[in-house]
């Protein structure tokens, strides 16, 4: 009998130790639950519960086993819940927007391509494969990629070759934009890249400030020169104001006589105007109007030249000899030569 009491006391001490260790893991059950741990821990087992060898009956043992089984399920459920939370946390961290601008993303895609050029669809495929954030939000950001390609000078459009089938043009980087990012880091950009010279012709010629034509690949910067008279070469023939211009003959058919008459501008200017001579309406004036066309026709009998017309305009347009000499001397002293230009 004493042996049975010692064994019961030993089991009771083990139960107290188990409660202290797993007190946080076990849920509190109701008082009427037959498998409640309180009914076995805080109550003294009776003789009816004990067997012949001083152990608990199978019914109580099954209760303890079920309690331990339920606690194991709760532990597995707790660990599973924590795993789900960790998994969800990883998914949320993967969907964070990358710290790169659209220009940086396009630059990365083009630089990692084999031929250093990609189409719009190729750029979008690269971004979607490398960044899951943009993969889930495609194609909402495709228009942003298209706008950045067309509005930034650092990207150059390359037409597709005739023998290369496909849709869309290629895009590549401007060779002068290699230093666009600070120390090669795509997180920071120094400033917006702008082309230094504007392309004016399709054949690749660029017009610079002093009206020189050079290829766009040559990095030449035109120097600013003051607005002065240009130097006139020595072999350049400048017409003098004393040299008469060649006569220009114009033949006009005459409907009255059927012959060609040669008109002269001097006779037109020398012809007196009689518009204000007679203002009264008389028979003589009316009869005299029929004779005026003959006078006009007879006055165009000489050669028509431009000497008198260009005499005044030539003096205004062309500088005098002294001005040309001074301009030529000052231009020879201040000639500026630009390398690489004709």
Curated annotation (Swiss-Prot):
Transmembrane segments: none annotated. It is found in: Nucleus. The keyword Transcription regulation applies. GO terms for biological process: anatomical structure morphogenesis; cell differentiation; negative regulation of DNA-templated transcription; regulation of DNA-templated transcription; regulation of transcription by RNA polymerase II. It comes from the Eukaryota. Residues 71-83 have a biased composition (Basic and acidic residues). Signal peptide: none annotated. Residues 97-191 bind DNA. Residues 1-89 are annotated as: Disordered. One of its GO terms (molecular function) is RNA polymerase II cis-regulatory region sequence-specific DNA binding. SMART domains: FH (SM00339). InterPro entries: Fork_head_dom, FOX_domain-containing, TF_fork_head_CS_1, TF_fork_head_CS_2, WH-like_DNA-bd_sf, WH_DNA-bd_sf. At the onset of gastrulation, expressed in the superficial layer of cells in the dorsal blastopore lip (Spemann organizer). In the open neural plate, expressed in a row of cells destined to become the floor plate of the neural tube. After neural tube closure, only detected in the tailtip and a small area located at the midbrain/hindbrain boundary. Its main location: nucleus. Residues 59-70 have a biased composition (Polar residues). Pfam families: Forkhead. One of its GO terms (cellular component) is nucleus. Transcriptional repressor. This is Forkhead box protein D5-C.
